[in-house]
Amino acid sequence: MKRKWLAALLAASLLLSLTGCGGGDSTESTSQTLSQSEQEVTQPVTSEPEYNEDADTIQTAPVKSGTIYISGDRGYSTYGFSESNTLEYCRTVSQAARELQGVATVYNIAVPLACGIDFSNAVQEEMGWSNQGEVCDFIYDHLTDGAVAVPIYDTLRQHKTEYLYFRTDHHWTALGAYYAYQQFCQAKGVEPKALEDYETMTFDNFLGSYYEDSGNNTALGNAPDTLVAYLPSSTNEMTFTDRNGTVTPWKVVYDATNYSRGAKYNCFIGGDQPYEEIHNPTLNDGSAVLVVKESFGNAFVPFLVDDYQDVYVVDYRYYNGSINDLCREKGIDDVIFCNNLNATGTPSRISDMQRIL
C-alpha cells in the first residue's frame, strides 16, 4: 500500500499520462545515484486490503519520562528515518540475495516499532517521528536482486488493539512475531501453523527495558507485562554457541519463571547468542532456514521450528562467520533478515551485517 509520500509522484504520473493522450536516526537526504540493479525493485509478494489506518490509535501525545515516552501505562521509544542509511541496508540485503542466487532465497522482514503502530499519524507527525509505514514501503521498494519483501506493517496496524508489543519493554510480543510468521508463510506460498495449535508457557511480572529507561516510572511499574511464549510441537531442543565458542544445549523456549523481572524476554532461543541450531526430528526433507537477526528475531524463530528440518540462527552483532559460506555448508534454502526499523537505519548494525556476508 503506497502512502501519502508517494501521492505527489502518482499524481504527476497520471497528469503526464493524460497529457500524452491529448486530453528505517533523524531524517537525512542522499545525492547518491542508484545503480540500474538497485532500480529493479522487488515488489512485495503479498497485498492487504485497504483499512482505516488511524482507527483505534492513540490520539494524544505521550510525555517524556527518562529517555523514553509514556502514554498511560505504556512506554515508547522514538523513530527517525535516515534515507542514506536505510538505502545502505537495502543494498546489504540485496547483496546477500545476489551472492546467494541459486543457493537460497533471501527474505526481508522490517519490524516497526510500537510507536508507529499505536499512535495516530497526526500524533506521530506532532512528535516529529517518521511514518514507519512509509519507511517499510521505502525498504521494500529498494530491495533488488531477487530479495523478497515480507510486508508486515499493515498487518500489525490492523491488529493494533491486540497485545503486539510489551508495555514495559522495547520488543514485540510473540503474538506480534506470529503475525510476521503468517506473512512470511504467505510470501513463501505455504500454510502457516494456526496459533491455537501451539502449547504456551506464560511468565508474569515482566518489567523490561522501558521500565529502567523511564527511571522506574510508577505507571509502568504498576502494569508489568505478561509474556506468553508459543512452543514448537516438533522439538524444544536446541544448541547455541556463545561468544567464547562454547556450545551449550538449551531450549527453544526456556522456562523463565525464575529469571529476574527484566530478563524474561531471554526465554526465547537463549537470548542474543552468536550462533544457534535447531533440528526437527519429525522432518527428513532437507529443508533448512537461516535467520539473520537482532533481538527482535528471538520471538520469531520458534514459529519456524515445525516447518523446517533445520533452523539456523545468527545474531550479526556477535557472529564472526560468513552466512554465504554457512548457507552452502548447511544446504540452507531460505534466509530471513529480521530487523526492527531502528536497526535498518543504524550504520553500526548495517556494518555488522555487511561483515558477515
Residue ranges with predicted function:
Residues 1-19:
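Sec-dependent bacterial lipoprotein signal peptides
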